[in-house]
């Protein structure tokens, strides 16, 4: 999405909502691409590193979360720069991109407006249906980028399909192919730039075509 606009993840300050395996895997990838993950959260609250989480600081988060029942608040013991606050104050933090990786319907219309007001350029779902229908309407109205779970979670399906034969390059090629298919489908059906609509339409067409091939339609 950023590449289509002549941009990249390099230097982008990224708010991660969640602290589970997906959230930490997202942070690892963001660091790899030169982005700066600045938050993690769980039921107890959120931790905020103003200068971002380095690989070393991410290892500390992993160690904490791998302990049964451990909460993120413990992280501030190991960092002189981190801040810990209640979940509702998380959206007060300015960011370039937001990656919700927690519960369904975490991001509603109020949350999207709050993020946009702080300069957020887009939301990329790391979990299923993190953005509510009302939130999606505000995303479109305010012109923010939106990476829906129907696109972002395809990598997991590809890995399962390829099995042990999967490698990073093949995964990257497949993800790019799916992204372009979704983008082109959205454009074809008069929904240019709407990856949520494009992915749903593309999925429907694929199922319909298979049914027709088998004489079910």
Task: Give the positions of each predicted feature.
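Adenosine-phosphate binding glycine-rich loop
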Residues: 2, 116-217
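Rossmann-fold NAD(P) dinucleotide-binding segment
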Residues: 85-95, 105-122
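General beta-strand structural signal in soluble alpha/beta enzymes
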Residues: 16, 39-42, 84, 99-100, ...
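Short glycine/serine/threonine-rich phosphate/pyrophosphate-binding segments
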Residues: 22-26, 106-110, 131-133, 154-156
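A general structural motif
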Residues: 79-82, 99-107, 127-130
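Short glycine/threonine-rich loop-to-helix capping motif typified by GTGT followed
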Residues: 21-30, 112-113, 136-137, 207
